[in-house]
Amino acid sequence: MRDLSADHALLSLNTATVRKQGDLLAIIEACARHGVRAVSPWRDQVAAVGLEKAVRAVKDAGLKLSGYCRGGMFPADQAHAREARDDNRRAVDEAAALSAPCLVLVVGGLPQFSRPGSAPSKDLPAAHAQVEDGIATLLEYARAAGMPLAIEPLHPMYAADRACVNTLGHALDICDRLDPDRQGGLGVALDVYHVWWDPELSAGIRRCGRDRMLAYHVCDWLVPTRDLLLDRGMMGDGVIGLRRIRSEVEALGFDSFVEVEIFSNDWWSRPMDEVIGTCIARHRTVV
């Protein structure tokens, strides 16, 4: 396992971690000032400043990307299916413009939540099928653009509204069906917040292999958790076995950035420099 204690050269900041404290340009400037070498921006943050400005800011700051958030939200009724397809193609194009190593896919849940305005449904198996069909269609476009797709399994509490792929095993099943020969361009983004509880996690990581492990995200699970979405913990403040999981991921040969992604009303209320400084300290000591 890599030694992270000496510096934070392998730290990436998902820009949602400080989204309330400043726009993307301010976040990029702060990361460069703190010696953070990589970011993973969100599409809405890029749109707010403009894609060209975002591309230039990343380049001028000498930063790399560890991913781009996000594509997905595939389930939709017939009236919204083209919207989903076109939106995901735009996400691929944006990721390519930013030189992202992968586009992270939050696949969506039931159609009325994935694509608002879609007819209400309770048919979860149909949503699963739409997700797989949507990834299959997007994969062809993404491969032509040279942009790998990283399926991110989300915690089961998000199955209805955010992602109906809820285990690493399910994500890998999709990868194996759509890319049986492991030609590349399709894998997973593993976020410890979503998968730490899974008794099959270690087996899933081994099954993943280096070629399918496209991104690795860290934060912590607080007890109690006060909000289903906006109460992630800073690394070391919760109950996730962060070093154990990272050791298993890195045993595959994973050598890319460790990305900090924290949605937290608590941490959003603090100054950006304090949050980034804490991320750096915890990256060195507990991740």
Regions found by a protein language model. Name each.
Residues 28-47, 69-73:
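N-terminal substrate-binding region of glycoside hydrolase catalytic domains
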Residues 40, 67-69, 104, 150, ...:
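Conserved beta-strand positions in the central sheet of alpha/beta enzyme cores
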Residues 3-4, 60, 80-187, 197, ...:
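Active-site acidic/histidine proton-transfer and metal-coordination neighborhood
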Residues 17-19, 43-47, 71-73, 107-111, ...:
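Active-site-proximal loop/turn and secondary-structure-junction residues that shape catalytic pockets
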Residues 1-15, 66-75, 110-118, 158:
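N-terminal small/glycine-rich loop or linker at the start of catalytic domains
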Residues 10-23, 72-85, 121-127:
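Active-site mouth loops of central-metabolism enzymes
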Residues 38-59, 110-114, 158-159:
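Glycine-rich, proline-tolerant flexible connector loops at the mouths of alpha/beta enzymes
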Residues 1-35, 99-100, 115, 136, ...:
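Histidine-acidic metal/acid-base catalytic patches
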